[in-house]
Amino acid sequence: MSDIIREIEREYMRSDIPAFRPGDTVRVNVKVVEGNRERIQAFEGVVIKRQGSGINETFTVRRVSYGVGVERTFPVHSPRLASIEVIRRGVVRRAKLYYLRERTGKAARIRERRLARPEEA
């Protein structure tokens, strides 16, 4: 039975999702329907958690807008997501960054992960 469910879920899984982790800054482009029009709205912020697996996987992005913290949770494999871009990679030691909710300004900064340079030929 679970093989049938897994097979059906595999059809709906997206393959164009980049690898990202909590601490990374991402820009999520979401398809928004307004009346009979559809437009793309960008939401940029820090990934504070990623949970679930398979088709049920979600991630939460946090940003501060006009001094107010805004968190938005997206299903990873949703057809409403136009694209996900990784802006910066962050260095964190936790899988859930709930402690960022209490921090503001410089205290909420996350160090950038430096990637190994490709060797010059």
Curated annotation (Swiss-Prot):
Keyword Ligase tagged: no
GO cellular component term, pick one: cytosolic large ribosomal subunit
PROSITE patterns for the chain: RIBOSOMAL_L19
Gene name in the database record: rplS
Similarity-based family: Belongs to the bacterial ribosomal protein bL19 family.
Ligase among keywords: no
A GO MF term: structural constituent of ribosome
Organism: Symbiobacterium thermophilum (strain DSM 24528 / JCM 14929 / IAM 14863 / T)
Single Gene Ontology BP annotation: translation
Entry keywords, A to Z: Ribonucleoprotein, Ribosomal protein
Protein name as catalogued: Large ribosomal subunit protein bL19
InterPro entries: Ribosomal_bL19, Ribosomal_bL19_CS, Ribosomal_bL19_sf, Translation_prot_SH3-like_sf
Classification via Pfam families: Ribosomal_L19 (PF01245)
Primary role: This protein is located at the 30S-50S ribosomal subunit interface and may play a role in the structure and function of the aminoacyl-tRNA binding site.
Disulfide pattern: none
Lineage: Bacteria, Bacillati, Bacillota, Clostridia, Eubacteriales
